[in-house]
UniProtKB/Swiss-Prot annotation:
Keywords tagged on the record: Hydrolase, Magnesium, Metal-binding, Mineral balance
Tissue and organ distribution: Has a 120-fold higher level of expression in bone compared with a range of soft tissues.
Major location (coarse): other
Species assigned in the record: Mus musculus
InterPro entries linked to this entry: HAD-like_sf, HAD_hydro_PyrdxlP_Pase-like, HAD_sf, Pase_PHOSPHO-typ
Protein name: Phosphoethanolamine/phosphocholine phosphatase
Family, per entry: Belongs to the HAD-like hydrolase superfamily. PHOSPHO family.
NCBIfam families hit by this protein: DKMTPPase-SF, HAD-SF-IB
Deleted gene: phenotype: Mice display growth plate abnormalities, spontaneous fractures, bowed long bones, osteomalacia and scoliosis in early life. Primary cultures of tibial growth plate chondrocytes and chondrocyte-derived matrix vesicles (MVs) show reduced mineralizing ability, and plasma samples show reduced levels of Alpl/Tnap and elevated plasma diphosphate (inorganic pyrophosphate; PPi) concentrations. Mice lacking both Phospho1 and Alpl/Tnap show a complete absence of skeletal mineralization, leading to perinatal lethality.
Membrane in keyword set: no
Length: 267
């Protein structure tokens, strides 16, 4: 399929009731990265670049809940002090396997032309995410990669910074994905792009917060049995009417692809 408008003159309303512009992307598809696109937590994966492929207990003991980004800043600093360079870390990121079926899913999405606008929101880091996606051949699919800024400093060592500040009590201090997605939607609205539906593919607890932006007709794709899925189930049980989006748990990315294929058939 080369586009979303096989019928001449077919136009649809966006989520806010506006008429969708011809040729504009109809659906926003948002992906998480760790344990969603890739089948590992990339912050754990880079330990393979450390001496002895492990971190000292004194460093691991500095982690505090809600301040994981600050902890990872210390991890990157330690790795740099041990002689680990960005090229060494890139080599690790490039070998992290995709989740089962993810390569096929991303190829399928890429073939849909203007149907989907695809973005990535990740609490990992830009250097790692982009390294992995380029190695897998999928970097160009994503219109925007929204992650904690990282890159070599003047000494040639990899550094990490927080994405932003926010006031959300549920999310880590460095990133609230609800805020990230909300700001992106406002930005695209200013560009004149109004999506008909939102699709969100994730796994972690921090992927639950942006679920508040999803409305009826939108779809949440939580990885089955992971924190995002459990939090959605708890919310549905506590107050069934409060969770408006359709929920499609996935075990492999083929589950996501199958549902998206059904969506396109109904367009």
């Amino acid at each position: 399929m080369s586009g979303c408008f096989p019928a001449v003159g077919l136009r649809c309303l966006s989520r806010d009731g506006r008429m969708a512009a011809p040729g504009a992307p109809r659906f926003l598809l948002t992906f998480d990265f760790d344990e969603t696109i890739v089948d590992e937590n990339s912050d754990d994966s880079i330990v393979r670049a450390a001496p002895g492929q492990q971190l000292p207990e004194s460093l691991r003991a500095t982690y505090r809940e809600g301040y994981y980004n600050e902890y990872m800043q210390r991890v990157f600093k330690y790795l740099g002090e041990q002689g680990v360079r960005p090229r060494d870390l890139r080599a690790v990121y490039e070998t992290i396997p995709l989740s089962p079926g993810m390569g096929d899913l991303l190829q399928f999405i890429a073939k849909q032309g203007s149907c989907f606008e695809v973005i990535l929101i990740s609490d990992a880091n830009t250097f790692g995410v982009e390294s992995a996606l380029r190695a897998a051949g999928h970097h160009s699919l994503f219109r925007r990669i929204l992650s904690n800024p990282s890159g070599p400093d003047a000494r040639g060592l990899l550094t990490l910074r927080p994405f932003h500040t926010h006031s959300c009590s549920r999310c880590p201090a460095n990133m609230c994905k609800h805020k990230v997605l909300s700001e992106y939607l406002r930005e695209r609205a200013r560009d004149g792009v109004h999506f008909e539906r939102l699709f969100y593919v994730g796994d972690g607890a921090n992927d639950f917060c942006p679920m508040g932006l999803l409305a009826g007709g939108d779809v949440a794709f939580p990885r089955r049995g992971y924190p995002m899925h459990r939090l959605i189930q708890e919310a549905q049980k506590a107050e069934p009417s409060s969770f408006r989006a359709h929920v499609v748990p996935w075990e492999t990315a083929a589950d996501v692809r199958q549902h998206l294929q059904q969506v396109l058939k109904m367009c």
